[in-house]
Amino acid sequence: MAPKAEKKPSEKAPKADKKITKEGGSERKKKTKKSTETYKIYLFKVLKQVHPDIGISGKAMGIMNSFINDTFEKIALESSRLARYNKKPTITSREIQTAVRLVLPGELAKHAVSEGTKAVTKFTSS
């Protein structure tokens, strides 16, 4: 039998030293918080306009935030579908208005359309 070859320990390059700051701690990148946009402050403002003496729990606020996100997503999906049907590359206020009429029920759709029209008019006039 042939003698086994001796294994040499693989030589690794020495690890780079950590940079030391003036305070003596190691220099690390700070983790930045991922900002999540919510409608919580706006929901709270509307609640105080309608019922100034009533509060809302954090869980209920989270549910309302999810509801608004879901509704906006439905409107965006429907308006993009309408633009595709009409072979238009752009979603205009007309597609949004029609999508709102399709997504929201009855009287709520009428109020949403009138408030949206009012907001667009105010935006274009300023």
Swiss-Prot record:
GO terms for cellular component: cytosol; nucleosome; nucleus. This is Histone H2B.5. There is a cross-link at residue 122 (Glycyl lysine isopeptide (Lys-Gly) (interchain with G-Cter in ubiquitin)). Can be acetylated to form H2BK6ac, H2BK33ac and H2BK34ac. The nucleosome is a histone octamer containing two molecules each of H2A, H2B, H3 and H4 assembled in one H3-H4 heterotetramer and two H2A-H2B heterodimers. The octamer wraps approximately 147 bp of DNA. Keywords: Acetylation, Chromosome, DNA-binding, Isopeptide bond, Methylation, Nucleosome core, Nucleus, Ubl conjugation. It comes from Arabidopsis thaliana (Mouse-ear cress). The lineage of its organism: Eukaryota, Viridiplantae, Streptophyta, Embryophyta, Tracheophyta. GO terms for molecular function: DNA binding; protein heterodimerization activity; structural constituent of chromatin. Core component of nucleosome. Nucleosomes wrap and compact DNA into chromatin, limiting DNA accessibility to the cellular machineries which require DNA as a template. Histones thereby play a central role in transcription regulation, DNA repair, DNA replication and chromosomal stability. DNA accessibility is regulated via a complex set of post-translational modifications of histones, also called histone code, and nucleosome remodeling. Transmembrane segments: none annotated. SMART domains: H2B (SM00427).
